[in-house]
Every structure is written in structure tokens, then in C-alpha cells.
């Protein structure tokens, strides 16, 4: 089977649509809307999307530079995700100090654990139940999923680098990744019990890694942008994607958080269904991609990270300000306030920082020393210029984006160089070494990377810029902005 090459990819609006579905399910679940008892499964969709996009980005970076660019990767994750989190934590603590001072200390500890992305383990260690309905919702009880994603972003690139070093062949790596995922699903089932609270099973990094890992496995065989599929393949992809959507809707409408089926097979089936949707969503001209690219879904997906972050503080605090006997009035007010806060955060915090950096966000000018100003974005540009990115986001990744920098200049040796001995074929004088480096066709090509590095000297390990048709340079292909394909997803 030919090796899939992770070429530069363009903005993928269908991934915004997938994010939108995930965050809608989660919000409806936390609003206790009848019929959406399985809405918590939306978090699992974010996990799989994040695993796919993060791994696509890392593979792309390795094919382009020979390394994973870990320093740049981690710095961008921080820039992508932390500003909005800090804003939500500060706003929550201020509101708690005014409205419910008796709970301030407990919220403070939750906020600290969320800031350092260990909230899931803090919840487990403190024996706090995620499913406790009697104590009422807490404003930061949803931060556990962001903690799992950030822990994955920290550990997974290191593990991936080790696997590239030890196994080399992607088929072997895929088997190892799938085996790890199956082990995670087995542990999820083993720790769940109808006789006990299942927060440990539901929020453990080890028990929830399965969805992230299977998303990562897909990235090895199905690039984040499929360039060409024939009519028959497109039909099968649509069958796969539509079946996946149907399966997820069925799970959301029939599953409950106290159901043991959620742990024995529900989350595993959810992951497989999400993989089917992803396969169809990144292929050109599929019906699934068209449906998920509808403008309302795209709009929600772009703001899914903020919606995920803000919805639980709003769910917790709105009843203190809005006294009503109608649950629908409370739900409508909660939704309106959540979307408003998420939109303001996206407009004035998240997007400017993604585009211009922390300091540049104040002046509207890019200040990153390793990036160049990007041309104004538009639909035509967005269709062709970008690179695979992660998500985050709820991942959200929401989170849950592509790189936000223009491709760096390359220094090419001026003297004529005989490439025959290096590349195993004759290169014409107008064929750049960079073109060859971007398409490793076999295992031998990867082994020649050090030789190529002597001819083409990259000044940075960053992938090329992403253009978002609405947000401008730096937007991520699936709704978020940065080098995750749209936050994270991406990214709750």
C-alpha cells in the first residue's frame, strides 16, 4: 500500500462541524435536557479528534524537517489553550467570591488543579463524584477533560518520538498504538462497577486514552487532507460517515451516565463511530463533509473551545441570578450567556493571541521572532495554504489548528550538487531538495533525511501557515486557531 504523505492541507470546515456536534451534546447534557442523557459522550468525540489532529501535525512536521519540533509544539499548545482557561478561572473565582463565598476555597483548589492540568486526578483523589446530581453543578467540574488532553499533549509526542526511533515502520507502530488503546478500554471496563461511583473510570487518563490513541492510529493511514478519492470510495466513505453519525446520535439519545454499557462498549463504539466520521470529513466532496460544513455548524465549531470552557460556570451561577420555575427559561438564558461569553473570548482573547502572540495581541501586530507576517486571508487563499494541525480542542479541543506562521525561508547551497548518490535518482537543476524532502515515499527516503539536511537548511521546524476564511492568518482547519487543526481541540 502506498505510504500516505501528509501534505500541506487547507482549512477543513467539516471538522468544525464535528466539533459543533460534540459541544452541543455536552452542553445539552449539562443542562439536563430530556433525551440527552448520553450527551457526555461528546467529550469522547473531542478526544478522538484531538488524537487524530495532533498526530497528523507531528507526522507532517517529521516528514518536513526530520524531527517533531517539540519545543515549538508545546509552546503553541500553551498559547492556543491557556489564555482562555486563565480568563475562565479568574472570572469564576471572582464570581464565586461575590456570589457564594462559602464555596470559594473549594473552587480555588479546583482552579489550581485546572491551571496545571491535573484536575481529573485532583477530582479522583478528593473522592469527588462527577455524577453527583444532589450537590448541584460546580463551575469547574468539566475541567477534567482538558487536563487529560494536556497530559496527552505532553506525553504523546515523547512516546511517538520513541516509537519512530525503535520501530520505524508505521505498520508496527500502528499495531502498538492500537494495542495500547485496547488496553485502555479494557481498564475502563475493569474499573467500572454498578456498585460504586465511577468517576475513577470515567476521568482517569489511563482509562480515557483509548479514544485519543485510536485517533492517533488513524492519522498514520488517513492523512488530514485526502487529496483524491474516486466515486466508489466517496460513496463508501459517506456510508461510513453517515453510519458513524447515526451511531453517535443513537448513543447520545439512549445512553445514561449511570449505564454500565457506557464503560463496557459505549465509549469504544463512540470512538469507532467518530473515526468513521473523520475518515469521511477529511475527504474531498463527500456528503458528510458537506453536511458538517454548513455555516451554523462551522460558526459553533469555531467557538467550541470557548463554549465548552464557559458553559459550566454559567450553568452553576445563572440560577443564582435568574429566579424562575421554568427549566426552559433557565436553559435559554444559560445558552445565550454561554455563547455570548465564548464569542467575546474568541474575538478579543483567543483569536488575537493565536494570530499575533501574547504581546502582539495588544498592538495587533505579530511579534513572534520566528514567524513572518501572513497575507490577508480569503476563501481562495484558504483553499490552498495550510498544514495539518491538532484540535484541541475540545478539545477541544475545542479543542482542539494549523500552524500560524508563514513557511520559513530556506537556504539552498548555491554550487551545483550531484544528488544522485543521495537521492538514488537524478535531480534536475530546477527541482528543489525541499520538494523531495516533503514526500518520503519509502523507508529508505526517511533514512536519507540527514543527507538532505546538509543540502537544505531549514531555519525552523514549524509547519507552514494556515488560513481561516473568516478568522485570517493563524486559524486552524477545524475551527480553532493555531497548529491544531482548528483545540482544542479542541478542545474540551
Over which residues does each language-model region extend?
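Hydrophobic membrane-embedded alpha-helices
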Residues: 2-15, 21-373, 388
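Extracellular/periplasmic envelope-modification machinery, especially enzymes
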Residues: 192, 217, 232, 254-257, ...
Amino acid at each position: 500500500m502506498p505510504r500516505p504523505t501528509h501534505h500541506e492541507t487547507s482549512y477543513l470546515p467539516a471538522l468544525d462541524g464535528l466539533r459543533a456536534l460534540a459541544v452541543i451534546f455536552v452542553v445539552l447534557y449539562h443542562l439536563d435536557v430530556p433525551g440527552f442523557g448520553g450527551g457526555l459522550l461528546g467529550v469522547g468525540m473531542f478526544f478522538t479528534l484531538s488524537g487524530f489532529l495532533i498526530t497528523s501535525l507531528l507526522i507532517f512536521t517529521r516528514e518536513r524537517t526530520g524531527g517533531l519540533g517539540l519545543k515549538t509544539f508545546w509552546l503553541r499548545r500553551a498559547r492556543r489553550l491557556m489564555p482562555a482557561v486563565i480568563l475562565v478561572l479568574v472570572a469564576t473565582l471572582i464570581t464565586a467570591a461575590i456570589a457564594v463565598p462559602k464555596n470559594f476555597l473549594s473552587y480555588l483548589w479546583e482552579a489550581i488543579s485546572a491551571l496545571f492540568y491535573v484536575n481529573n486526578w485532583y477530582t479522583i483523589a478528593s473522592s469527588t463524584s462527577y455524577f453527583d446530581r444532589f450537590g448541584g453543578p460546580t463551575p469547574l467540574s468539566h475541567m477534567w477533560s482538558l487536563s487529560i488532553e494536556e497530559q496527552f499533549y505532553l506525553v504523546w509526542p515523547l512516546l511517538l518520538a520513541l516509537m519512530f526511533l525503535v520501530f520505524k515502520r508505521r505498520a508496527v507502530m500502528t499495531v502498538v498504538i492500537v494495542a495500547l488503546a485496547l488496553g485502555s478500554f479494557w481498564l475502563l471496563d475493569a474499573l467500572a462497577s454498578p456498585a460504586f461511583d465511577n468517576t475513577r473510570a470515567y476521568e482517569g487518563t489511563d482509562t480515557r486514552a483509548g479514544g485519543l490513541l485510536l485517533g492517533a492510529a488513524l492519522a498514520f493511514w488517513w492523512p488530514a487532507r485526502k487529496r483524491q478519492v474516486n466515486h466508489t470510495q466517496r460513496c463508501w466513505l459517506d456510508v461510513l460517515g453517515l453510519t458513524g453519525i447515526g451511531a453517535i446520535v443513537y448513543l447520545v439519545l439512549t445512553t445514561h451516565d449511570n449505564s454500565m454499557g457506557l464503560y463496557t462498549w459505549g465509549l469504544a463504539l463512540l470512538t469507532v463511530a467518530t473515526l468513521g466520521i473523520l475518515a469521511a470529513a477529511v475527504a474531498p466532496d463527500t456528503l458528510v463533509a458537506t453536511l458538517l460544513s454548513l455555516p451554523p455548524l462551522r460558526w459553533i465549531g469555531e467557538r467550541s473551545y470557548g463554549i465548552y470552557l464557559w458553559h459550566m460556570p454559567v450553568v452553576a451561577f445563572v440560577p443564582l441570578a435568574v429566579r424562575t420555575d421554568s427549566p426552559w427559561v433557565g436553559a435559554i438564558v444559560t445558552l445565550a450567556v454561554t455563547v455570548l461569553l465564548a464569542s467575546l473570548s474568541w474575538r478579543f482573547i483567543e483569536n488575537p493571541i493565536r494570530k499575533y502572540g501574547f504581546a502582539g495581541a495588544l498592538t495587533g501586530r505579530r511579534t513572534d521572532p520566528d514567524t513572518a507576517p501572513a497575507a490577508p486571508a480569503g476563501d481562495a487563499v484558504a483553499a490552498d495554504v495550510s498544514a495539518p494541525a491538532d484540535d484541541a480542542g475540545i478539545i477541544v479541543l475545542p479543542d482542539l489548528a494549523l500552524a500560524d506562521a508563514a513557511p520559513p525561508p530556506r537556504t539552498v547551497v548555491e554550487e551545483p550538487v550531484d544528488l544522485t548518490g543521495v537521492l538514488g535518482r537524478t535531480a534536475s537543476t530546477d527541482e528543489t531538495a525541499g520538494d523531495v524532502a516533503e514526500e518520503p515515499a519509502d523507508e529508505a527516503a526517511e533514512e536519507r533525511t540527514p543527507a538532505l539536511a546538509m543540502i537544505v537548511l531549514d531555519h525552523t521546524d514549524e509547519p507552514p501557515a494556515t488560513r481561516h476564511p473568516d478568522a485570517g492568518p493563524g486559524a486552524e482547519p477545524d475551527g480553532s486557531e493555531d497548529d491544531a487543526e482548528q483545540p482544542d481541540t479542541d478542545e474540551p
